[in-house]
Amino acid sequence: MNRLRNAKIYVERAVKQKKIFTIQGCYPVIRCLLRRRGWVEKKMVHRSGPTLLPPQKDLDSSAMGDSDTTEDEDEDEDEEFQPSQLFDFDDLLKFDDLDGTHALMVGLCLNLRNLPWFDEVDANSFFPRCYCLGAEDDKKAFIEDFWLTAARNVLKLVVKSEWKSYPIQAVEEEASGDKQPKKQEKNPVLVSPEFVDEALCACEEYLSNLAHMDIDKDLEAPLYLTPEGWSLFLQRYYQVVHEGAELRHLDTQVQRCEDILQQLQAVVPQIDMEGDRNIWIVKPGAKSRGRGIMCMDHLEEMLKLVNGNPVVMKDGKWVVQKYIERPLLIFGTKFDLRQWFLVTDWNPLTVWFYRDSYIRFSTQPFSLKNLDNSVHLCNNSIQKHLENSCHRHPLLPPDNMWSSQRFQAHLQEMGAPNAWSTIIVPGMKDAVIHALQTSQDTVQCRKASFELYGADFVFGEDFQPWLIEINASPTMAPSTAVTARLCAGVQADTLRVVIDRMLDRNCDTGAFELIYKQPAVEVPQYVGIRLLVEGFTIKKPMAMCHRRMGVRPAVPLLTQRGSGEARHHFPSLHTKAQLPSPHVLRHQGQVLRRQHSKLVGTKALSTTGKALRTLPTAKVFISLPPNLDFKVAPSILKPRKAPALLCLRGPQLEVPCCLCPLKSEQFLAPVGRSRPKANSRPDCDKPRAEACPMKRLSPLKPLPLVGTFQRRRGLGDMKLGKPLLRFPTALVLDPTPNKKKQVKYLGLDSIAVGGSRVDGARPCTPGSTARA
């Protein structure tokens, strides 16, 4: 009873501390380490019957990882369902499956194309060219790439036959481990020098296209030849590469080939590793452990996988990737490297890189003539079923695995002691970061979760790392002595990062190194994809009605000293407050000055297009006697290219200023009065309210408005006209007279009255005078 009571207390304490975990799969190291930290496991209930079905063999387990489980359990996956190698810390910490974003070759292929939006790096410098055969555009791009690669290979073969400057692994290719029987030699087929000329012209045209020399060209067939011409070109290429045909060339062609290859070296980052046999590796886009992978070197065979199969075309399952024909070999055997990294957060993106790794060897000597998977695939799930070739070097390990420390020692023996620290590790870190940057927006992440990934790299002869694929939930199986030690270490260090570091930011993180953490970005709340444009149509201006208007509040006056600081000099644009209304017993000119002084001081009024270009309309207001009636010409409100300046005057007119787009013969006149002649000079002494056209404005010499100032009397405000647009200039008159009967006026390069923009000419000088 005491034991049961203590167990109950222990569980209740773990529940309060949120230390409950569940494990799916075989993770004895994780279970042991969590129990040491006081966590309590919630056992999974395995129900019998049809409710729990094992996964189909054809379905992707790569979306859940390349889960090899244990080497002994790998063959018994049907009996023990392990769907996702996922362990759950009661919604606190989770291995997040992330929909297999990185495990899918399709996702990695497509995401890395967006790398230029994140960094100034070419994905082709660390990720072999990759295409989705199910997409029509990608299939066409792959066909053109295959053609161009064949043309480049012809140039390499010419140079190699002449100068032997492109060494290949002749010893490995002649190894007796090749499974393909040697064909009986016949009379060699001769290929004419015109074949080399076609390859040269295709490469030259490709270089000219990169230099944008094809902008004005209209060619139906891309890349120099027609599709039929390329088909014939490939047949002769196959004869040279695979059937031993003799490639004849002229001495002058050798130098051209060398020159063009040197130019291609600068624009094709993969020209060194791609070799000269045009081998591509075809992969199912959603499978792991090397299932369904094939190495092919004939275009027709690869296209047969998708041509005429609508299901494959729709699903886009097949991915074709350029095979690294010149990899770094260890004792004549191909190998790859498994590198772990940990993502603890996606916003901000936080990446931890594991310092230890291991390499996996193939069981067969390397050969480009033998395209069998046993030679070119280093997956342990494939190689464990094969026997080591008797032709392998005796220094290779029997279990086909090395630790990264043993690999570094081998590099020192090769005479490259700094290759690991200066080329390999920095290259792998950059490749991992770039792959995660491009996938960050497509991952359905959640807080308090993490994911451990396994990236596979192959190295070129120059030690350059090439990212092959990234697997979610990599295997933790202790298949060899190397993996037994390293896998236990990476699991223990993972818990140090995701659990211990939550309590102590300075705790030991083991072999994990923080290599990237971006600033946090606030994610806007998703409000749906509904787009809405609101507004109303612009109405056609109407003729001014004969009506009487009362005192109106003042229109917001937008002013600015020159240009800039629109928020400080345009309060009416950024706030709802209105400027004080001009009092009817005060001079309108004085009110304008006071409003102007409150905004920008006593300098010239001016506005800028930056603050006014969003304003909808312009309205000009004048003060007229309340009983005054107008007759309006029908075309008075139509914009004119050369507007005339209008002078309004009368016995009770306090602000004699306005600007209307009138012709020289158009004017306003009171009802019942005869219209004065267009060319007659207005008589300013007559106590009549009338409007007369003045001299046309010149953009270089703006003309002030001239009027008379009368005694103070009660006034009303009347609206003159509808929206007035496209004025070259506008002047505001200060009608306060001085002793010499002169008035001051303020010049504007543009004016906005009532909320709009009126483009203007040169501003007038403040303080200039004109006779009344």
From Swiss-Prot:
Coiled coil: none
Principal location class: cytoplasm
Residues where a protein binds: R289
Any one biological process term the GO annotation gives: flagellated sperm motility
Residues of the TTL domain: 151-510
Region (Disordered): 50-81
Tissue expression from the record: Expressed in brain, heart, kidney, testis, liver, lung, muscle, spleen, trachea and colon.
EC numbers on record: 6.3.2.-
PANTHER family to which the protein is assigned, alphabetical: TUBULIN MONOGLYCYLASE TTLL3
Record-given protein name: Tubulin monoglycylase TTLL3
Origin species: Homo sapiens (Human)
The encoding gene: TTLL3
